[in-house]
Amino acid sequence: MRSSYSEEDVILLLKDITGMVEPQPAKVREKLIQSGKHYSEMLPVEYVPTDQYMQVYHNALKHYAKPVANAVGMLADKIIENKGKKIVLVSLARAGIPIGILVKRYIKFKYGINVPHYSISIIRGRGIDDNAMKYLLEKYRPQQILSVSYTHLRAHETRSNL
């Protein structure tokens, strides 16, 4: 499956639908959703970010890189402290992947451990991907599997600012 992420950072446990579903613009998808089609049966058109978007991104990066790095470090340290070194990170596809990658990289940098990081899908109204969970549970003990998300990061960032 084609991805902008390196397999060294994350293994996507997603069904490859390349060539099976044609990406559609947001307005078309919204009309289809209103007519009863489920959003998970469609793909968005992936646009190249505009210069204005990239300017906002770089500005946010400049202002928030250090607090995010501190929160990632605190979270990763707590993970190792509470779960040990034989962990498996699991993030939700799209929104959870960046946090999972940052935590994985921090653990490798500080502890010298290359922990696995997988990403799975959860679909509103349909639930978590059973096949992905089955795969993970066949390969790892339940105690090793740890879900990471932006919510975990925000909780640690908030505590560090108290």
Language model segments and positions:
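N-terminal amphipathic/basic leader segments beginning at the initiator methionine
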Residues: 1-37
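Short glycine-rich phosphate-binding loop at a beta-alpha junction
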Residues: 86-92
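Short Gly/Thr/Asp-enriched flexible loops that form oxyanion-binding sites at enzyme active sites
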Residues: 99-107
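Long, charge-dense
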Residues: 106, 110-143
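Conserved small/polar residues in nucleotide/adenosyl-binding loops
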Residues: 151-158
